[in-house]
Amino acid sequence: MKIYDRNRNVLTLGQRVMIAATGALDVLKEAHTDNLTPYEAEHEKCVLLANSRERYAPIELIRLG
């Protein structure tokens, strides 16, 4: 399933992103969207970043480049 950042840009694995709340830069590592509706996939904390131990909702991220 496609996931979108807060600006409605498609997010893909390996892509650089910025965490909107902190401005920290990271790389999208995994997205666990199995059995989620499109709304849930956008708002649930289902994204893992390479250098962070937390999960993020795609709507909390901004795609870079």
What are these regions (language model features)?
Residues 1-16:
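Mixed-charge, Lys/Arg-rich low-complexity intrinsically disordered regions
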Residues 16-59:
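Basic/aromatic-rich interaction segments and small domains that mediate binding to polyanionic partners
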Residues 62-65:
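Short hydrophobic/aromatic patches at helix-to-coil boundaries
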